[in-house]
Amino acid sequence: MPAASLTSVRSFVAAPVPTRPAISVEGRRAFAFKGVEKRFGDKIVLDGIDLDVPAGQFVAVIGKSGCGKSTLLRLLAGLDRPTSGSLTLGAEEEGHSRTRFMFQEPRLLPWASVVKNVEIGLTGIAAGQDARQRALDILGEVGLADRADEWPSVLSGGQKQRVALARALVGHPQILALDEPLGALDALTRIEMQQLLERIWLAQKFTAVLVTHDVAEAVTLADRVVVISAGRIALDLEVPVARPRRRGSAELARLEGTILDRLFG
């Protein structure tokens, strides 16, 4: 990565995080699950999920492998349908995409430039001739404006995930669904991406739903942590810690302990 680009990214993520109350959301609803069940054949993956999320909230969903976390996210993103129960979404806002999904793998098109990959996120939105400029603007927000016309193959893993994040955000989604998007990154890159994600969330005020196995990541980023066990919500915990948050603080460690006790107790 060129030195200038690396410097710009690091200066961006290192800037102070804006102060925000621990829980600060608008009165609008982002979505609500009511009695949602999802079966695959005879297997019950989600069993009576009730979850009401206000617009603008950052929710982390955590649990052991196979507990139903990713299935919940797929239902929210419209990639699957519940077997029973209801999922209600808030009113769609003009000029905003409804929900965008970010996966653990960047899933970039190797034959398209970085900026063209980002423009794909405008599919279904009337961007017209502004598409390239909108893509360039969001690439600037993730620190990759100078890589816009390069091929994905020359980017590092962390840079590819920044492109994937830009693609998800270019349409100004109301809800961003994140399925362990940082799981494959090294520790330092992961922290930088966490800071970047938090900064953009604070600026754009979308609703974020992050599926993760990392309890520390959950309490660092989220307003609220939902623990799923055997397809049911075992814990729904607010994170009453004002931002900016100090990693490793006693407050966050205590919350981590509560979550781990529920996961393994």
From Swiss-Prot:
Residues of the ABC transporter domain: 31-255
Function as written in the Swiss-Prot or TrEMBL entry: Part of the ABC transporter complex SsuABC involved in aliphatic sulfonates import. Responsible for energy coupling to the transport system.
Localization of this protein: Cell inner membrane
Subunit structure, interactors included: The complex is composed of two ATP-binding proteins (SsuB), two transmembrane proteins (SsuC) and a solute-binding protein (SsuA).
Gene: ssuB1
Disulfide bonds: none
Annotated catalysed reactions: ATP + H2O + aliphatic sulfonate-[sulfonate-binding protein]Side 1 = ADP + phosphate + aliphatic sulfonateSide 2 + [sulfonate-binding protein]Side 1
Provenance organism: Mesorhizobium japonicum (strain LMG 29417 / CECT 9101 / MAFF 303099) (Mesorhizobium loti (strain MAFF 303099))
Keyword Phosphoprotein: no
The entry's keywords: ATP-binding, Cell inner membrane, Cell membrane, Membrane, Nucleotide-binding, Translocase, Transport
Protein name (Swiss-Prot/TrEMBL): Aliphatic sulfonates import ATP-binding protein SsuB 1
